[in-house]
Amino acid sequence: MLTKAFIPYRGYYSTPFTRWQGSLANEHSIILGAKTSKRFFESKGWNPLDIQYVLVGSTVYQKQWFYSGPWAAALMGATDAPGVLINQACSTSAFSIYQAGMGLETGMFDNSWCLLADRCSNGPHASWPNPNGPGGQVIAEDWVMDNFGLDPWAGGAMIQTAENVAKEYALTREECDALTLRRQEQYQQALTNDREFQKRYMFPVKIQISKKKILTVEADEGVFPSTPEGLAALRPVLPEGVHTYGSQTYPADGNCGISVTTRERARELSADPNLEIQVVSFGFARAKKGFMGAAVAPSAQMALDQAGLQIADLGAIKTHNPFASNDLAMAKVLGLDANGMNNFGSSLIYGHPQAPTGARLVIEGIEELAMKGGGYLLFSGCAAGDTAASIILKVG
């Protein structure tokens, strides 16, 4: 359990998420993320030189990604701060926040910034020399697509793990479609009153199109509404499977930033000094081969145990749900109402840019609890390699 790590209320942002090959498809994720963070600091009147350490969460290689931590720190104005690159697939956000929290807990630094930035669009195509190959043919990898399609240990694609979990927990096509419609309904809640909820945390992203033209993206792009009839008409992705392209997420682009600091500094930086946000605990798990979604529940239970909490103590639950079966399986194991989780949106609906996904979900959970007057937030999500991570925050 952590006791010394705090997040200032509104000391965070998420850009809109754009479906891949959209408006952010050609932007360098680290450069765009750092520049967006710098604009956010300016909007808050924060001095980036006060940041002592930068944690960059990113999973898709970009040019000179090797320098991500210190490079991003310098670009955002924190020129005296070192930085580290964290890549833990889709649980990168949870690990980044936890690592920042551990830095506070151990007294290594007093003020940190977590930048989560990724671009699934136009992923890199890597090649390695192979002199012993036929005619010297290189070893090649499409960074994004090849890793969607094959876990080198479990031996299957991501969608296969979802079907394995669905079969293990006796989940049906009808349940997956029904939950997708519920998640769509919850996302629509965030769009009411001219996106009133999203405007609590969403920060526009600006793209330099030319010397004279700047494109501003203010809202999510590429979210397709679902209907019962539309979902029912879709074929399963795998023969006899329960998931269609409607009941799984899609790759996206975007970035998020979160301040993790001391209680005193969090109060100074907070939009409401009376609304305290504490990083409380962390959990992790690994499921058996090819059962990625099954790791979510035990990781959540570990975070609860570390915090000394029960499910009934939670005020909000947010999950990274790349497949509808994720939430259904988690609900079965932990005795949850799947329909009550993920108010105001989730990655099943607004897309998955990988590293930033969890951060946006955490931010949305904070804002939901702020509206309710406070409570405990659980974020849980699966990650490549049949793993999962969870984090608990106390709001108020």
Give the ranges of each region predicted by the language model:
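Short, well-ordered beta-strand elements within core beta-sheets of diverse protein domains
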Residues: 162-172, 301-309
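N-terminal extracellular/periplasmic Venus flytrap/periplasmic-binding protein-like
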Residues: 14-15, 26, 30-35, 43, ...
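A short structural micro-motif
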Residues: 57-58, 182-186, 285
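Short amphipathic
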Residues: 7-13, 203-206, 276-285
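Conserved beta-ketoacyl condensing-enzyme motif
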Residues: 25-98, 103-132, 200-217, 311-334
